[in-house]
Amino acid sequence: TFTHYSNASYNQTILQKDAHISMGVENTYDLALNGSPYLIGAITTYGDSTNNSLNIKAGSSVEFFTFLPKKDKNGNNTFDERITHLVGGLAYQGNVKNNKIFIKDANMIIHGPSKAYASLAAAHISAGYIDSESDKNFQASKNLLDIDSFNLDMYMNHDKQPLAYNSVLFADFLGGKTEQGQALDNTINIKRY
């Protein structure tokens, strides 16, 4: 769901068993990502996002792609801001409240480059998220990230499955996040990891 100059409330995105989401480009070692891959319960610009949810059910899978490291103004490596985002409710210039992400026995798959035995990816996982470019404060409150186990795996483009491989997911796990304002009474509930 997307709204502009209005509120987004009580929307759901549900990944059922065997659903597979693949967002990104094949060769991010040589080619920068083009746009930001988002999987969201609801997004609004200039409004509030409340009571929305992203539900990633058992047996479903989300594929994360590798990313190019970028340099900040001090010359340090930093994540490409166009990494994969999983968000329950997102607002640009608005408040987020009572949004949720549920992850239960889902598959998080790192997409390895051709012939690779190791790969890494970055992600931003937040039940409620506010992006703001003004002096006004916005509030992220009572959002819930609920994790009941997920399986980390790697997709490999090989003729034969190797005996061993490495997959690493660098992620920010957040109940609620605001670029400017207050984050109050947000929860991360981890049952199994």
Where are the regions that the model predicts?
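Surface-exposed loop/turn motifs in large extracellular/passenger domains
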Residues: 1-85, 89-193
